[in-house]
Each structure stands twice: as structure tokens, then as C-alpha cells.
């Protein structure tokens, strides 16, 4: 699953990095919600092999509402439980070539919600990008990694995570992302 909003120049890179995974292609389905987009985001996503739903809602603009909409459409068209799990990405994300395989290894070990290492590709672009980079480094090194070593639960944030379909059996109820 991917949320997009005016990011047509970014999604093509994410779509390409998903399509280049070392994981079997027939086990990957890319869903995108083009959220309140008036540009070519939806057509770009479709050209990169995504099943794209378009959502227009000026009252409910958060990523959580976009994911809720997307999972409702998946439920209607495919059945949410017809997929073992769902990855959540933002359109400007890039994946290492073995990302899905490594996340699947953790999933196959019985984990139901898995977060991943996130890094910043534009650290020196501006102070906002640098601040986010420091936040991600701190979060991963001091929170997620330590909790993983101790086999404790952690939290998920924003992007780069996987959850079992049973988590959304009754829909996505988390709109404050």
C-alpha cells in the first residue's frame, strides 16, 4: 500500500524499487491511493504496475484516512484477507533489493507487525530533511533496535512497516497518522 499526494516524480522510483525486489513478483501486488491529487499521480502509479484508487475528500486529509479508504477498496475488490500482509510506504521511499525478502523472513517467524530501518536520502538538502534524518537515526538506534534485541514490542511510525492482514480484518481505524 502506498499513499500518494502530488508526488508523481517520486512514485516511479518507489515502483521501480518494488519491481526490482529479489522476492517473487507473483506474490507482490502494489496498491496506491492517489489522495486528493489533481496531477498525473494516478496514471504514473498505474504505468508502474500499481492498482491505483483515487480519493477526493477535503474534510479528511490525513494519511490515516487515505489508508482507511484504500483498505476499504481492497476489501471490496479483493477481500482484505486474501493477502497475508500489507506494507505501508510513502511515495518518496526507496527499497533495497532484498527489503521484502528480509521483512518476509521476520513475518514468517511469526511476527504480526514489523517495522524496518529507515534512512534519509537527502540529509543535506535543508534543515527540515536533516532534522528528520536525526529523528529516524535516534528512533531506530535508541528505540526500535534496542527493543528488538530485548524481544519487546515497539511502535510503528509513518512508513516502512508490514502488518498481518488479520490486523485490518475489520478495517483500518487509525486516522491520526
Each language-model region and where it sits:
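A conserved hydrophobic helix/loop-capping motif in glycosyltransferases and polysaccharide synthases
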Residues: 1-7, 21, 106
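Short, acidic, metal-binding catalytic loop of nucleotide-sugar glycosyltransferases
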Residues: 16-27
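Acidic donor-binding/catalytic loop of UDP-sugar-dependent glycosyltransferases
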Residues: 40, 89-106
Amino acid at each position: 500500500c502506498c499513499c500518494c499526494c502530488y508526488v508523481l516524480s517520486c512514485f516511479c522510483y518507489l515502483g521501480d524499487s518494488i519491481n526490482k525486489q529479489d522476492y517473487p513478483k507473483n506474490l507482490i501486488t502494489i496498491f496506491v491511493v492517489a489522495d486528493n491529487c489533481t496531477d498525473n499521480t494516478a496514471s504514473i502509479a498505474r504505468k508502474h504496475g500499481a492498482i491505483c484508487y483515487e480519493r477526493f475528500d477535503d474534510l479528511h486529509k490525513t494519511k490515516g484516512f487515505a489508508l482507511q479508504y484504500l483498505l476499504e477498496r481492497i476489501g471490496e475488490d479483493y477481500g482484505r484477507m486474501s493477502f497475508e500482509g500489507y506494507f505501508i510506504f510513502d511515495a518518496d521511499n526507496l527499497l533495497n533489493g532484498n527489503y521484502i525478502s528480509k521483512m518476509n523472513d521476520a513475518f514468517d517467524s511469526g511476527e504480526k507487525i514489523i517495522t524496518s530501518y529507515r534512512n534519509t536520502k537527502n540529509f543535506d538538502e535543508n534543515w527540515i530533511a536533516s532534522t528528520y534524518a536525526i529523528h529516524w537515526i535516534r528512533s531506530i538506534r535508541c528505540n526500535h533496535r534496542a527493543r528488538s534485541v530485548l524481544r519487546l514490542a515497539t511502535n510503528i511510525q509513518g512508513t516502512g512497516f508490514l502488518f498481518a492482514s488479520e490486523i485490518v480484518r475489520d478495517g483500518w481505524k487509525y486516522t491520526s497518522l
